Amino acid sequence: MTTPESVTPVESPAQLFLPLPLFAPIAVSAATEIPFAVPTVEDDRLRACVEQAASDPASALAEAGKWVAQARGSARSKPLQCLGHVHAVLLRWDAAEAAFAEAAAVAAAGDPLRLTAVLGQAGNAALAGDHPDRALIHFDAALKQPSGGPAARGQLQLDRARALVALGRADDATAAFAAAQRDAPEEPLVWLLSATFARRSNDLTAAQRLIEVASNLSPIDPDVGLEAGVIAVLGGREAAARQSWQSVRRIAPTSKAAETARAYLDQLDPPRPDSAESGR
């Protein structure tokens, strides 16, 4: 039988403290969404830019460049936000960060919700570009703005926690995760990443408690099941780990999480040489 210590973690995207996609559904619903009160022509153009970037980023990039060149003063903010989004789609993280940061800098006064969103986007771009120090500056600036509610603040605190982990500031990250849990208690990702952080900090008791909350909030999330299995096997509960990883393969058989779950299961139950020979 494989012992917990002998299982080599094969990290999945959810288990790594890598930046989330800038416009993943979770991020869009909170701090990095594009908030419109009463939509304007510029708002509609920004939405069209986001949609075009998904299908034809090259054309979207050209259109964004023209829009930025035509605008003046605070009117450049939304064109720059469009440009930042296109750069993010193209994985040009430094350029995306610069565009979002400039969009925040020239934004009109009196729109703190939008400023919070754009600063969050700048922070996520910096984090994706492996600049957690710059990301933290953007997130801290965003948190100084009226955020539109605790859920948005919770998302920013989660992003801030990821930056702090990348900077090796474990105590500060712990505080940021706690703030995210307080402000966004219904967000599964808050609990998932908190559990991962606790597990990596060798606090399996806390990790188990946190992953149970994530599982209750999102029982069919394959990344939650993957992390639950890792926590279980490290705690000596091999049967529970196997059950979690098998469920991941059933729930999302073609996903990256399912591939990782299979690798974990193979470590628990390695193929025997005689069975390999018989399969030839």
PLM segments and residue spans:
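Helix-turn-helix repeat elements of alpha-solenoid scaffolds
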Residues: 50-65, 89-102, 128-140, 166-170, ...
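Register position in tetratricopeptide repeats
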Residues: 89, 121, 128-129, 162, ...
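Alpha-helical adaptor scaffolds
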Residues: 146-217
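Helix-start (N-cap) detector for alpha-helical repeat units in TPR-like alpha-solenoids
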Residues: 42, 77, 111, 116, ...
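Structural marker of alpha-solenoid helical repeat scaffolds
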Residues: 70-72, 106, 110, 145, ...
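Canonical tetratricopeptide repeat
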Residues: 82, 121, 155, 159, ...
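N-terminal leader/linker segments that initiate helical-solenoid repeat arrays
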Residues: 2, 14-82, 270-280
